Amino acid sequence: MSVLQTPEKGPVIHDWRPEDPAFWGRSGKQTARRNLWISIPALLLAFAVWMVWSTVIVRLNAIGFSFSTDQLFWLAALPGLSGATLRIFYSFMVPIFGGRRWTALSTASLLIPALWMGFAVQNPSTPYNVFVLIALLCGFGGGNFASSMSNISFFYPKSQQGTALGLNAGLGNLGVSVMQFCVPLVISFGVFGFMGGQPQVLADGSSLWLQNAGFIWVPFILAVTVIAWFGMNDLSSARASFSEQAVIFKRKHNWLMCWLYLATFGSFIGFSAAFPLLIKTSFPEVIALKFAFLGPLVGALVRPLGGWLADKLGGAKVTLWNFVLMIVMVFGVLHFLPKGGEGGSFYGFLGMFMLLFITTGVGNGSTFRMIPVIFRTLHEKSALGRKPEQREQALKNAGKESAAVLGFSSAIGAFGAFFIPKSFGTSMALTGGPEMAFYMFVGFYLSCIVVTWWWYARKGAATPC
């Protein structure tokens, strides 16, 4: 198989000028699109493997295991902990190794937890500690997001980064809903025949192939790994050592945007991880897996809308009002929850949670759009009155710092995949319900409104965006 060629006839591109309209129209746009549309399925698979435990835990006890509700919430939360931690390192990998190489290698790493899970669930004597380790390894999928977003940011001009990053993240985020929709289907029959192992027999006499929750992703992981290796590009202009990228830790706006992204993406991925078990514990009469995929689906689909709105209206304005709506939706969810195990309305709860997922998706897109604008503005100000070559270097530095911040903030945001499921588990253990956790989220969103308004949205803000 031959490498898909660029105008430079190779996988490494040495001349990359997306801000040059002539270059962009001649060859840049086509190359950027190709890398984006290979990146998207790779990221979709990463999210599917990362969040697969959110579905598996709902059925584990039905096939012979005896784990407590708190233990099950831990299995849902642990991929978030490991994935978020890996993102811290993955966010610096693309400038060191190249986007093509790293996308292929990180996608291939998903084979480890996918295969191991498939074998482990077939043995009812598999200890809980083994499942803990597999759940942690599923964090490989969570780590991929940071490097993917960093990589795509290098390919697009500033004016189109919001839409491009929104598409990459939004369609990649669909991996959660695709997984939560497909897994209940594929575990209901022997997809792989004798190669997939024997079914587990449930108490009512029906059969379940829970191993398919892991095995189903293997052929797709292999295919996308090959496509990424031969179809994507490495940009030499995006190369930077860790020390060059580490300057972001001195940037105030890096930490501010990490705080905001923890509220938007952290909420999206945390609610996605906890939603199936939250439905099951709050509304036991409802078949959770019939509805669980809907929240991540709408949240992922509207993420590009958040980037587009930020391009048109300004990222800070969209983000500010989005946080206000998130608070309103949380109170709506609380209104429809059962009180003391009685009352409540599942469909009211579901509707308000869908609206909450929509706001997390819009916020994901708008906050990510803010980052490149903020750092380009800062570097443009620093280069005022300087020589043309110094201004050009300032723009390159802005691009590298933006990419590093995109990756690092996504790492911090991913901790929501750990904290939100664990918050629900702790709230239920202490109070018998999830309400305490929701009130904590409201307090956090209020702090984000203050940060967004003061530094980015108010009249006279130092860095409007």
List where the protein language model places each region:
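Hydrophobic core of transmembrane alpha-helices in multi-pass small-molecule transporters
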Residues: 127-143, 344-364
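Cytosolic juxtamembrane N-terminal segment immediately preceding the first transmembrane helix
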Residues: 1-48
